[in-house]
């Protein structure tokens, strides 16, 4: 196996048994590909902005004299880059410019001829751009647009499963769902009549829509029924026999022919009877008159002589009418063939309740339902019906809808028009009747073949189209009203509606969410999330159990484990590792093709619709070294069921064992040994882990860690290979390999690192280089670690030495006992950064002012502020400290003559301003790490703002100058090479200034040209550098675009260092969570025979009932991994030969069945072995992929190799007494996480504070600085104890007795500890409520 530069530093021992056939795909492609499709110019106009423009344009005026046509569009460049937008609170977007053509036609001419054409580029608002990591910056905050799982357009057949009607009768229905437009529902009622609903309005008989489609009664009956033909000869009635139709009926007369009786009267007609009739070629039988009476005729019969109607279609035959027909010489009568079994008379019955008799009356009936109360006209009714389903402007089935529609109706062709036609509606009704007749089955709406993914690009396109449609109306008005000769396209278009639609979507849509940025995993999971909620989706309240449940088609597409607990369970899912969406938006998953027992490496992606037809084997099926199945019977999936199949029947095989789970769940080692509920908690809690100050890779991982760290975008990855030329904390510079440079470029890559930046969740984003100077690196190597990554691997927590044992009740109910050593070593210390803003506004009474001159504030409070009134960087502040001094003007008060005089003498201004400074919130303390000042254009900048500006300018100039110098050096080194090849001495060149190098005359013309080219390049570089500096200077010095009325914004960033403490929540990766109960001195912790104390003590009772055994296996394997690390460490300390070290490490890698990974250290140099050993001395990292991990015997082998007991249990001694504990204890290394539920954020206390206006009781919650609720159950408790005075205190002075609490406060200040309870305000509220009911109630004094 070939290792990259960073992988060589620390190799994970992999226990995977099955080779990795398919690499893990780029994990953010669902977001990036979708948005790329949206903004990329699509010549066919099927996707993105192009499709939206083409669907709305051209726009014609109402009078048809003019037309506005769309030509093309282009996206400009963003004004600010991503980081600048985040700092300034701006949106990262690009201007959209559209080329439009206004065509004016000649009036009063029969053939329209073009009079004038005007073409112009028009600005159409801003389009937010996606960053490289799949997010959007909206108003300075990073947001993610979550993909939506919605019902696919098409036709769906369903039933109510007998729940609607009291009789329990199953009622079938069909629904045509377009991508946009009106829904069309067909449904049976309990009487078996068929109805239609448009847009869920009042139901109408289905025949109304058929009449509206211009069918008469005869045509309707012809469409849906087979005919029985009765011939009348010599007063005998002969039935033209279709023998299959008789099956299942009871003969009401003897069925005979030529004297032979085939079926006796009263007998049921069976298949055997029908066979006999066929055998004897019986085509007709004589039937009694009673047999034909009551049957329904299929067409109108008119008297040929008089033209009088004898009988109308869909009427029952009676003896009288039969005689009339005979008399009018009708000797052949057509009736409808119906029976109770499989040819129901539904349409015939529905025609009877239909009040309409022709097309116009049907259209009017539809109009009355859709537009009740509006006046009826023939044109209006026709227009409405035409626009409902047959107009491209109002109805769009989309290519997906048409494909699903045609597939559902078993048509051969799956493409077609995107509107409905007559045949579509009739075919749907026919299929629904077939289902009612027992032929065919209803659809499963939770099948992933009926639900599709709508990603960012598609949702943005829909929003954009909505904006365009709003513009279209205005344009039509202007084209009809305005003076066309002077109008230009620019005057037609108002970009506001488009911008508003886009802004509304990205800013306030339910699916555009504030990014979860706790750690790299939470970012990646948020971008891969799939929600069934949102516009056009489900709502929490209406979603039933079936929609939320795991469906067989989720296999390999949607994770069955990762979903939130609570009301959203099952509605918000996560994409599986290998899943992707196809061109129609359906999820598909990869499989390996199988040919005659041979499993090939050919990969096919199948959607849920296609998958049902194949037999698919599991990924862990046994195959030999030639990739043939070993067993004859193999466990497979087919049509959603799992069972054993002969290996010759197998079509496909799963690609990987981790195919079914999401990224989050695939990071849980030994997932196969955990209960699903706990695995769900484990996957969810990993997303809440706070990045620690010192990162530590997991000793026991799953091999997914590197993929998550790299794809999340928090690490810095090399774009091209080369040598590290320069490195410091904030930038890495690489001299690119010659073969990877383009012609005419300097061959230098510069990577700037992010330092101590605040994330959305107030955690700290900081990147640290993990490479050294002059090291050779390859493309895609990790250069710098971000938050929660260690040498390019995800590192969410710390490896802790844990013991499973009770310890003096400190681990009761999942509590965790932690050693003081963990705090001392800063193992779980985290940095949190808070942003506090102070806004200076222009008020009615005058502008607010930011200054250090604040009324009634002592010198001490202002000691941390500079003369501009803004806190210094580096100041340590605590709750209540002033960060930014601000004064607000208050209303003028009447002054006495004395005050006026004093003010005139001393210029005293303090009385007409009030203090509105920004202070540190209660309970928060930290260090000021940065200050940003934004000043409105035209407002004078203060001294501090100018200082910050100068600093930024200096830094930008220094960075760009250094960059330029490096590029320049690179260029001159190339020139030096060329000149030295002409026997010009290097020493001579070094003494010569660079400018004179170009003047050296060379005979070789080609080389001379080359040098001239390099000179041009140098000049070009210089120009670019100057331009860059100018752009940067302009950006830094220009005024900021602030909200109306805002003069200045000061943002102060506070960094808080938080150590772990009692009350913090911790968890493992298996759903084993708990709260720290005590930080115990290290000397009191249990220790082993070597005197090594444990770090954490966990409760063993937390394991059996929770059934998450994965944590125990992880602990054992972690112990073995640490043991190997200790051995390597001892060898390093003893300075053993590198060959011995190499042998030992090779031996460790060869333990167990390493079928996936064969590590060969022969290719490694001595330095590389030493580097590897140094990184392995803290423990050998292990990868145990989900469902393909280490077996029990392999863990024992590892423990044995580390000279540890194979039981994984060791004897421990009590740290306080030194006594040995009664029995051996499970001790090992578990990966523990500190979750973002910190006691500092939750702990809160109040003495006095704000009160509710109505009840006068203290507010609730930390945010409102509220009190503790003393509810009715607490009142009962005090009543039960008889603590009457305590209770009185609680209900009066400590709550809503306004006078009492004021008096009590005064008494305490005076040192008088007495209280006088009065009337609680809530009693007055009760009186008022009773009075509001019209009952007078008064308090009487006795």
Swiss-Prot record:
Catalytic reaction list: RNA(n) + a ribonucleoside 5'-triphosphate = RNA(n+1) + diphosphate
GO biological process: DNA-templated transcription
Entry-linked PROSITE patterns: RNA_POL_BETA (PS01166)
EC number: 2.7.7.6
Keyword Cytoplasm assigned: no
Keywords annotated in UniProt: DNA-directed RNA polymerase, Nucleotidyltransferase, Transcription, Transferase
GO cellular component annotations of the record: DNA-directed RNA polymerase complex
Top-level enzyme category: transferase
GO MF, one example: ribonucleoside binding
Quaternary structure note: The RNAP catalytic core consists of 2 alpha, 1 beta, 1 beta' and 1 omega subunit. When a sigma factor is associated with the core the holoenzyme is formed, which can initiate transcription.
Function: DNA-dependent RNA polymerase catalyzes the transcription of DNA into RNA using the four ribonucleoside triphosphates as substrates.
Family that this chain belongs to: Belongs to the RNA polymerase beta chain family.
Protein name: DNA-directed RNA polymerase subunit beta
Organism: Buchnera aphidicola subsp. Schizaphis graminum (strain Sg)
Gene, per the UniProt record: rpoB
């Amino acid at each position: 196996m070939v290792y990259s530069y960073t992988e060589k530093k620390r190799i994970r021992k992999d226990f995977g048994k099955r080779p990795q056939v398919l690499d893990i795909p780029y994990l953010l492609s669902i977001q990036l590909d979708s948005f790329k499709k949206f903004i990329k110019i699509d010549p066919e106009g099927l996707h993105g902005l192009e499709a939206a423009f083409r669907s709305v344009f051209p726009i014609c005026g109402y009078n048809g004299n003019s037309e506005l046509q769309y030509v093309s569009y282009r996206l400009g460049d963003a004004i600010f880059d991503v980081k600048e937008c985040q700092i300034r609170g701006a949106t990262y977007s690009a201007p959209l410019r559209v080329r439009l053509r206004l065509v004016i036609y000649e009036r009063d001419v029969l053939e329209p001829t073009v009079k004038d054409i005007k073409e112009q580029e028009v600005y159409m608002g801003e389009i937010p751009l996606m960053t490289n990591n799949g997010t959007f910056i909206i108003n300075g905050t990073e947001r993610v647009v979550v993909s939506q799982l919605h019902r696919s357009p098409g036709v769906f057949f369903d039933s109510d499963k007998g729940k609607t009607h009291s009789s329990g009768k199953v009622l079938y229905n069909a629904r045509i769902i377009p991508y946009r437009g009106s829904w069309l529902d067909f449904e049976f009622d309990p009487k078996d009549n068929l109805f239609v609903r448009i847009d869920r309005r009042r139901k109408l008989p289905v025949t109304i829509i058929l009449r509206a489609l211009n069918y008469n009664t005869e045509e309707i009956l012809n469409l849906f029924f087979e005919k029985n033909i009765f011939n009348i000869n010599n007063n005998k009635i002969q039935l033209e026999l279709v023998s299959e139709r008789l099956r299942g009926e009871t003969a009401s007369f003897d069925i005979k022919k030529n004297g032979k009786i085939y079926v006796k009267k009263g007998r049921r007609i069976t298949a055997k009877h029908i066979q006999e009739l066929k055998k004897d070629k019986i085509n007709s039988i004589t039937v009694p008159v009673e047999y034909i009476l009551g049957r329904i005729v299929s067409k109108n019969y008119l008297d040929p002589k008089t033209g009088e109607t004898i009988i109308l279609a869909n009427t029952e035959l009676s003896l009288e009418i039969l005689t009339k027909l005979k008399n009018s010489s009708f000797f052949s009568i057509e009736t409808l063939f119906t029976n109770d079994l499989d040819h129901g008379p539904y349409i015939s019955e529905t025609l009877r309740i239909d009040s309409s008799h022709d097309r116009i009356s049907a259209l009017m009936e539809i109009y009355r339902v859709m537009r009740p109360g509006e006046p009826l006209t023939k044109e209006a009714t026709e227009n409405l019906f035409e626009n409902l389903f047959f107009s491209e402007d109002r109805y769009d089935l989309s290519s997906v809808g048409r494909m699903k529609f045609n597939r559902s109706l078993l048509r051969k062709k799956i493409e077609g028009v995107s509107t409905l036609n007559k045949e579509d509606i009739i075919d749907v009704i026919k299929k629904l009747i077939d289902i009612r007749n027992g032929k065919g089955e209803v659809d499963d709406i939770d099948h992933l073949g009926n639900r599709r993914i709508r990603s960012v690009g598609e949702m943005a396109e829909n929003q954009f189209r909505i904006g365009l449609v709003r513009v279209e109306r205005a344009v039509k008005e202007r084209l009809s009203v305005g003076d066309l000769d002077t109008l230009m396209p620019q005057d037609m278009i108002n970009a506001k509606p488009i911008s508003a639609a886009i802004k509304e979507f990205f800013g306030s849509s339910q699916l555009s969410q504030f990014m979860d940025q706790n750690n790299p995993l939470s970012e990646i999971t948020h971008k891969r999330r799939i929600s069934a909620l949102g516009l056009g989706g489900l709502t929490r309240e209406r979603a039933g159990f079936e929609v939320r449940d795991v469906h067989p088609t989720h296999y390999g597409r949607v994770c069955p484990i990762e979903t939130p607990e609570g009301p959203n369970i099952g509605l918000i899912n996560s994409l599986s590792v290998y899943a992707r969406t196809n061109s129609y938006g359906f999820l598909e998953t990869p499989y390996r093709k199988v040919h005659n027992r041979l499993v090939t490496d050919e990969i096919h992606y199948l959607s849920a619709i296609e998958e049902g037809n194949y037999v698919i084997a599991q990924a862990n099926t046994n195959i030999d070294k030639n990739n043939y199945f070993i067993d004859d019977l193999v466990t497979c999936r087919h049509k959603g069921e799992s069972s054993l199949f002969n290996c010759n029947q197998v079509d496909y095989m799963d690609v990987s064992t981790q195919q079914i789970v999401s990224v989050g769940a695939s990071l849980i080692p030994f997932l196969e040994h955990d209960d699903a509920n706990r695995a769900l908690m484990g996957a969810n809690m990993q997303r809440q882990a706070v990045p620690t100050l010192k990162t530590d890779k997991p000793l026991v991982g799953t091999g997914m860690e590197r993929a998550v760290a790299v794809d999340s975008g928090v690490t810095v990855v090399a774009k091209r290979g080369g040598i590290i030329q320069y490195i410091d904390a904030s930038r890495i510079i690489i001299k690119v390999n010659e073969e990877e440079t383009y012609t005419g470029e300097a061959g230098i890559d510069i990577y700037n690192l992010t330092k101590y930046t605040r994330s959305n969740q107030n955690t700290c984003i900081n990147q640290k280089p993990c490479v050294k100077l002059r090291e050779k690196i390859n493309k895609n190597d990790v250069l710098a670690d971000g938050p929660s990554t260690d040498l390019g691997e995800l590192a969410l927590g710390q490896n802790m030495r844990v013991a499973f044992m009770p310890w003096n009740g400190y681990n009761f109910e999942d509590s965790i006992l932690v050693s003081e050593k963990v705090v001392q070593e800063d193992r779980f210390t985290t940095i949190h950064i808070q942003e506090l803003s102070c806004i200076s506004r222009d008020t009615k009474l005058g502008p607010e002012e930011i200054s250090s001159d604040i009324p009634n504030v002592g010198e001490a409070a202002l000691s941390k502020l500079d003369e501009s009134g803004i806190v210094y960087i580096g100041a340590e502040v605590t709750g209540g400290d002033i960060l930014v001094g601000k004064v607000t003007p208050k209303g003028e008060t009447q002054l006495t003559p004395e005050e006026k005089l004093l003010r005139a003498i001393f210029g005293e201004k303090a009385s007409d301003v009030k203090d509105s400074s920004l202070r540190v919130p209660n309970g928060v303390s930290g260090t000021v790490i940065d200050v940003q000042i934004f000043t409105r254009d035209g407002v004078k900048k203060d001294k501090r703002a100018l200082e910050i500006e100068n600093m930024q300018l200096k830094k930008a100039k220094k960075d760009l100058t250094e960059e330029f110098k490096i590029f320049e050096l690179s260029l001159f080194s190339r020139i030096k090479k060329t000149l030295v090849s002409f026997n010009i001495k290097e020493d001579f060149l070094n003494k010569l200034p660079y400018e004179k190098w170009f003047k050296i005359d060379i005979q070789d013309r080609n080389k001379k040209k080359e040098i001239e080219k390099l000179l041009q390049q140098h000049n070009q570089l210089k120009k670019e550098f100057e331009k860059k500096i100018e752009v940067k200077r302009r950006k830094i010095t220009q005024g900021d675009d602030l909200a109306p009325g805002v003069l200045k914004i000061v943002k102060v960033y506070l960094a808080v260092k938080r150590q772990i403490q009692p009350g913090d929540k911790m968890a493992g990766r298996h759903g084993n969570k708990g709260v720290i109960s005590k930080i115990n001195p290290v000397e009191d912790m249990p220790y082993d025979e070597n005197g090594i104390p444990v770090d954490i003590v966990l409760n063993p009772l937390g394991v059996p009932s929770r059934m998450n055994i994965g944590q125990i296996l992880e602990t054992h394997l972690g112990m073995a991994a640490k043991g190997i690390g200790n051995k390597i460490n001892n060898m390093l300390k003893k300075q053993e030969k590198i060959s011995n070290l190499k042998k030992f490490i090779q031996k460790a890698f060869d333990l167990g069945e390493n079928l996936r990974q064969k590590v060969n250290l022969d290719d490694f140099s001595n330095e590389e072995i030493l580097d590897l050993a140094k990184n392995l001395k803290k423990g050998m990292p292990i990868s145990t992929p989900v469902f393909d991990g280490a077996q029990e015997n392999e863990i024992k082998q590892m423990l044995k190799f580390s000279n540890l007991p194979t039981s994984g249990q060791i004897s421990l001694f009590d740290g306080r007494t030194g006594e040995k504990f009664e029995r051996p204890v499970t001790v090992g290394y578990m990966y523990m996480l500190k979750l973002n539920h910190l006691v500092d954020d939750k702990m809160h206390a109040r003495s006095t504070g704000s009160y509710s206006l109505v009840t006068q009781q203290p507010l609730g919650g930390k945010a409102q600085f509220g009190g503790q609720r003393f509810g009715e159950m607490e009142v009962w408790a005090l009543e039960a104890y008889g603590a009457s005075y305590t209770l009185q205190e609680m209900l009066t002075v400590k709550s809503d007795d306004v006078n009492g609490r004021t008096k009590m406060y005064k008494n305490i200040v005076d040192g008088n500890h007495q209280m006088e309870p009065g009337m609680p305000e809530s009693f007055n509220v009760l009186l008022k409520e009773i009075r509001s009911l019209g009952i007078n109630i008064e308090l009487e004094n006795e």
